[in-house]
Structures are given as structure tokens and as C-alpha cells.
């Protein structure tokens, strides 16, 4: 808010001088800058979602209606938690192959295979519901990245948990293999974009 107030103060100061004719133009530009941001961001999300959807369809043979429906959710959750949307899309490919109804033997559910008994308190709502599931999976991944300090280790944590990774060499190797698989899916998707 400082900038517009300061800007308009300067304009009013010079309104009777040779800067006066520019006041209207400056007001229009400033207004567009502040009101246009939301439409630019929404167009950006729409364009990025469309591009991601096309890539998911090509790279992973996902049906167009599924890719179109999930891509905006992936972009929005990735933006919210500062995760690369291509990485998130690759995690979904690894976890569920874009099938929402998947339930693992361990009880993990949905697209990102979240285990409700561990995450229900942190991620309220129905974790089978696509948006809730993607948002929760993204939150978990971002949290693990902060804890691990790098994405490959965060991916390993996502698969076997930090405790499993740090306490058991077999689990650590399993997590590292998982991270490599996700990174391979990420590479394939990047090539399709």
C-alpha cells in the first residue's frame, strides 16, 4: 500500500505542472497492475494446467478427462507448498497411476496414497476425495523436503517414512529406489511438456 499512496502523492504534487497530463495514464496503469494480477494468475494456472494435462496424457497415457480434472489441483497444491508440479505429477504416477480408488495393503488411499491413520489429524476431510488427497500428499512431500533438506531424500521419506529410512538399511534402500523411480517419471513428463 505504500507505493500507491506515495505515487499518488507525487502525482498530486505535480498535477499543475508539466506532469499533470500523465496523472490519468498513471492511475490507469496502477489500477491495471493491481486489479489485473488476479486474472493474470488465474490465466497462468489455466495455461499451466492445460500444458501439464497434455504432458500427463502423453507421458503416462492418462485419459484426457482425468488429466484435465487433476492438473489444476496439482498446480494449485504445488504452488501452495512450493513443490515442482512436475515432481508432484510424477509422485502421483508412481503412487497410483492416476487411479483415485487405489487402496494399498498398508491402508494408503487415493492418488497420492496417503495413510489416513497417520495423516487424518494434519489433513482433515475425506482423503479419498481428489483435491484433499493431492493437497495432503503435497503437504507431506513439502514437509519431508524441509526435514530432509533435499528432494531425493524427501521422496524416500514419502515412501518409507523418516523413521524407516533412518533406522533400517533395507528400508533406506527401498526409499532410495522409490526416489529414483519418481525422478524417472519426472524426467519422462518433462520430456512430454
Predicted features by range, described:
Residues 3, 7-35:
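Sec-dependent bacterial lipoprotein signal peptides
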Residues 38-96:
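Export/targeting segments at the very N-terminus of extracytoplasmic proteins
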Residues 51, 69, 73-76, 86-87, ...:
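Extracytoplasmic/secreted proteins, especially bacterial periplasmic and envelope-associated proteins
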Residues 59-63, 77-82, 92-102, 115-118, ...:
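Sec/Tat-exported extracytoplasmic proteins
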Residues 96, 150-178:
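Acidic helix/loop microenvironments that form the catalytic cleft of cell-wall polysaccharide enzymes
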Residues 104-122, 137:
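Substrate-binding/active-site groove segments that recognize
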Residues 124-133:
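A short, structured beta-strand-centered segment in the mid-to-C-terminal lobe
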Amino acid at each position: 500500500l505504500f507505493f500507491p499512496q506515495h505515487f499518488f502523492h507525487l502525482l498530486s504534487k505535480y498535477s499543475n505542472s508539466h506532469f499533470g497530463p500523465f496523472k490519468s495514464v498513471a492511475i490507469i496503469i496502477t489500477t491495471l497492475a493491481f486489479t489485473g494480477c488476479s486474472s493474470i494468475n488465474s490465466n497462468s494456472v489455466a495455461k499451466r494446467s492445460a500444458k501439464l494435462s497434455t504432458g500427463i496424457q502423453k507421458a503416462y497415457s492418462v485419459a484426457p478427462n482425468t488429466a484435465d480434472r487433476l492438473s489444476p489441483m496439482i498446480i494449485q497444491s504445488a504452488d501452495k507448498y512450493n513443490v515442482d508440479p512436475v515432481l508432484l505429477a510424477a509422485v502421483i504416477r508412481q503412487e497410483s497411476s492416476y487411479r483415485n480408488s487405489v487402496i494399498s495393503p498398508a491402508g494408503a488411499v487415493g492418488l497420492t496414497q496417503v495413510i489416513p491413520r497417520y495423516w487424518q489429524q494434519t489433513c482433515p476431510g475425506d482423503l479419498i476425495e481428489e483435491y484433499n488427497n493431492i493437497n495432503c500428499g503435497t503437504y507431506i512431500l513439502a514437509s519431508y523436503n524441509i526435514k530432509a533438506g533435499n528432494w531425493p531424500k524427501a521422496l524416500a521419506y514419502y515412501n518409507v517414512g523418516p523413521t524407516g529410512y533412518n533406522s533400517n538399511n533395507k528400508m533406506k534402500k527401498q526409499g532410495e529406489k522409490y526416489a529414483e523411480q519418481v525422478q524417472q517419471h519426472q524426467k519422462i513428463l518433462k520430456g512430454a511438456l
